Swiss-Prot record:
Organism, as annotated: Haemophilus influenzae (strain PittEE)
Reactions catalysed, as given in the entry: (S)-malate + NAD(+) = oxaloacetate + NADH + H(+)
Keyword set, alphabetical order: NAD, Oxidoreductase, Tricarboxylic acid cycle
Name of this protein: Malate dehydrogenase
EC primary class: oxidoreductase
Alphabetized GO MF terms: L-malate dehydrogenase (NAD+) activity
Binding residues for NAD(+): G7, A8, A9, G10, G11, I12, G13, D34, N94, I117, T118, N119, M227
Lineage: superkingdom: Bacteria
Signal peptide: none
One GO location term (cellular component): cytoplasm
Pfam families xrefs: Ldh_1_C, Ldh_1_N
Protein's job: Catalyzes the reversible oxidation of malate to oxaloacetate.
GO biological process: malate metabolic process; tricarboxylic acid cycle
Amino acid sequence: MKVAVLGAAGGIGQALALLLKLQLPAGTDLALYDIAPVTPGVAVDVSHIPTAVNVKGFSGEDPTPALEGADVVLISAGVARKPGMDRSDLFNINAGIVRGLIEKVAVTCPKACVGIITNPVNTTVAIAAEVLKKAGVYDKRKLFGVTTLDVLRSETFVAELKGLNVSRTSVPVIGGHSGVTILPLLSQVQYAKWNEDEIEPLTKRIQNAGTEVVNAKAGGGSATLSMAQAAARFARSLVKGLSGETVVECTYVEGDGKYARFFSQPVRLGKEGVEEILPIGPLSNFEQQALENMLPTLHADIELGEKFING
């Protein structure tokens, strides 16, 4: 099994490289790529950690050597948010970066499972899909927007608020990966009893948690460490699925289009990537209304990505 990280010298990428070196199964190959010349050094640095994961680093304009033979590709390349920016402000720069990298994936490892971390995920996943489609290699079972951080934050905040064991707290998060499109299904959390006045503030905190980090870092970055852990968890789940285990994660994929062309919901992962898209289950009145309210934003985000490629 080979996992490639594109954008491995960045704030998310370096932390992700460390976590994957520690957490991937023994015998996995880990390829680290970034345009920055420091990248082979990042690979040497993490290669000194004593685990049976083989690491190689690549830098320069062309990610092809890192992508050759890859089963899983994680894309975290791009610019990060700064105070006053929202994820859509990143679009102008990151859209072109994702397009260029996915064009290389389409040629070098078209059958790989691709996890998009680069924001705005609602839009960059649509860009990736259209690039792969133009190349004639699009398989919707193998393209994912990594929304796992919304799940991690939900689990953390719910466990803190309700005094639950965080390792046993599970919160499905549906929709997209920015602002109002992030919808934690708090009504489905086991062992949590909610007062009416708790739901909306907690939902808003989860939706705006990225901004909480950006502001707290005072211009010094965005959520890189927690995002890296989220991406590592998702990568491990993908690798388990590809190895024949049954794993369920919430992720942003192309499904039946009931709500939007791309939509985050629980997905059973397996040998072909998406094995089954699971139902979102019963919603509270608050959640049903929030779902309906988010859809125009989500549709517009997706359309932006489609138009970026198709004009």
